[in-house]
């Protein structure tokens, strides 16, 4: 996609992480792994990097996923006051701006896979909302094929990917903002992992 603005992604829930671009990160066990029939997740209300979320800027432009605070502003979050966001356009303080070609990865902490990962996402600018992103699982240092490809709108939608093929394994979920330029921001919020059974 091209000529949009930003895709916003908020509340992604999974734990583990750390590493450098293009280097698989061995996951570590999350004590909050969902039990069968239960859900655990992340709403990004506390520092996601302290919780083990990591980011990668594979396009190398210096712009990446950011932890956004909507307190006292009109920033678009699904719930609470925080979300994660990645830009496909960067405003200039002097007017205008720069179209970006993001290939930005947001990678969760490690967790034991259940059946499903759900998340809420939206474009920040209603006129440039069609941000695109893919969702992947990282298991044993190997990144899966894309499990789902999504296009944002100006209102939050719930996305979901089936991770039952990885059930019982220690994994991470990764959100890749890419295949887009010249929109604005992708917002991601409330990521939840459902246990199997």
Give a label for each model feature.
Residues 135-139:
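Conserved aromatic beta-strand anchor motif in extracellular beta-sandwich/beta-rich domains
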Residues 1-11, 99-105, 178-196:
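Extracellular carbohydrate recognition
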Residues 2, 101, 112-114, 152-156, ...:
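Surface-exposed coil/turn segments at beta-strand junctions on protein surfaces, enriched
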Residues 6-8, 66-110, 125:
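Surface-exposed, low-complexity/disordered Ser/Thr/Gly/Pro/Asn-rich loops and linkers
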Residues 1-3, 44, 106-125, 133, ...:
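Extracellular beta-strand-rich recognition modules
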Residues 35-91:
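Extracellular glycan-recognition surfaces and repeat-rich motifs
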Residues 17-35, 197:
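Ser/Thr/Gly/Pro-rich low-complexity, disordered linker/stalk segments of secreted
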Residues 140-167:
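Extracellular carbohydrate recognition and processing domains
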């Amino acid at each position: 996609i091209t000529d949009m603005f930003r895709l916003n992604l908020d509340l992604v829930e999974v734990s583990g992480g750390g590493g450098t671009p293009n280097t698989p990160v061995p996951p570590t066990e999350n004590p909050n792994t969902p039990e069968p029939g239960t859900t655990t997740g992340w709403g990004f209300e506390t520092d996601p990097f302290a919780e083990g979320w990591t980011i990668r800027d594979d396009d190398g432009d210096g712009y990446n996923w950011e932890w956004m605070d909507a307190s006292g502003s009109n920033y678009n979050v699904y719930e609470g006051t925080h979300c994660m966001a990645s830009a496909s356009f960067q405003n200039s303080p002097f007017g205008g701006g720069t179209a970006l070609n993001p290939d930005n990865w947001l990678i969760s902490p490690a967790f034991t896979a259940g059946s499903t990962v759900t998340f809420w996402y939206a474009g920040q600018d209603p006129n440039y909302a069609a941000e695109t992103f893919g969702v992947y699982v990282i298991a044993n240092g190997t990144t899966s094929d894309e499990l789902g490809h999504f296009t944002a709108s100006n209102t939050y939608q719930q996305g979901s990917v089936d991770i039952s093929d990885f059930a019982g394994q220690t994994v991470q979920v990764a959100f890749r903002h890419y295949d887009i330029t010249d929109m604005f921001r992708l917002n991601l919020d409330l990521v939840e992992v459902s246990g199997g059974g």
